[in-house]
């Protein structure tokens, strides 16, 4: 009746978010991801061990939201279109730890509509929030008062004001941010104990060096940094396990990665001037290395 899919790469951390930052895509922990389509029949029953639920509806609206999902006690992660908002407390599963709101596939006639979370619906168990597409500059109305224990945020900063809401989530440990432009995201979030940071689509002048505020960093992903990166700066992160530098063409002191025994994964794409000998040494010393 339903199409079972393995959890996609972008979801591999969701099941144990806040508990184990790496190696969480083991099949015994992963659960099933269901794509729910309007013409595919009934929802899973209460007895089904469904960990992930994703809705794909041709023309979604709140009227399409199935209240039955509140009975799925095993449900940990839910992905829904923003057209389902606002929801009531009775419509949401109690044990949800991850919520994805999809604002990518908006109909033209809905372009001027502003969908927003019901501020009376609190989600104290929620640890991961992902917004796909425009967050309307206010995280679709989701504030620290609504989600006080949020650990993971994933959103694109189409509106720079969004960063001022994000910095108020006191328990935040992971910030996956796109469309950062020149917003000094690391300076805004320096008071947080971030373990995972990702910055996509920066513009010239973006200050990547402020990543140094996060001494407990375990995973860092930087995309399209225009300025030269001195790789020796990563030596200040004693817990760094995974590093991705994508389309960061100007790198120096790349050999510094040989001095990082904790580093288990290094991915450098489209960088210039790294010798074959150094590439070979990096691959010999780092378990997962693509240079």
Task: Locate each region found by the language model.
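N-terminal basic/disordered segments at the start of proteins
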Residues: 3-11, 15
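Residues that cap or delimit alpha-helices
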Residues: 6, 44-45
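Concave beta-strand-loop units of leucine-rich repeat
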Residues: 12-42, 51-65, 74-87, 91, ...
């Amino acid at each position: 009746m339903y199409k079972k899919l393995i959890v996609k790469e972008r979801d591999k951390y969701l099941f144990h978010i806040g508990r184990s930052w790496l190696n969480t895509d083991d099949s015994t922990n992963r659960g099933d991801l269901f794509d729910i389509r309007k013409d595919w029949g009934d929802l899973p029953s209460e007895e089904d061990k469904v960990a992930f639920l994703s809705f794909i509806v041709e023309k979604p609206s709140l009227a399409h939201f199935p209240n039955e999902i509140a009975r799925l006690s095993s449900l940990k992660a839910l992905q829904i279109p923003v057209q389902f908002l606002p929801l009531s407390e009775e419509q949401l599963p109690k044990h949800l730890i991850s919520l994805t709101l999809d604002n990518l596939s908006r109909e033209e006639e809905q372009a001027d509509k502003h969908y927003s979370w019901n501020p009376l619906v609190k989600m104290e168990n929620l640890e991961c929030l992902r917004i796909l597409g425009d967050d309307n500059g206010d995280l679709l109305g989701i504030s620290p008062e609504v989600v006080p224990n949020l650990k993971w945020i994933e959103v694109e900063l189409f509106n720079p004001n969004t960063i001022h809401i994000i910095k108020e989530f006191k328990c935040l440990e992971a910030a996956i941010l796109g469309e950062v432009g020149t917003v000094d995201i690391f300076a805004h979030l320096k008071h947080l104990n971030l373990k995972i940071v990702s910055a996509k689509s920066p513009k010239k002048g973006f200050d990547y060096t402020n990543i140094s505020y996060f001494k407990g960093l375990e995973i860092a992903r930087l995309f399209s940094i225009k300025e030269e990166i001195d790789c020796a700066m990563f030596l200040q992160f004693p817990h760094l396990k995974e590093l991705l530098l994508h389309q960061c063409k100007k790198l120096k002191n790349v050999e510094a990665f040989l001095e990082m025994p904790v580093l288990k994964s290094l991915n450098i794409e489209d960088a210039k001037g790294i010798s074959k000998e150094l590439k070979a040494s990096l691959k010999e010393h780092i378990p997962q290395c693509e240079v």
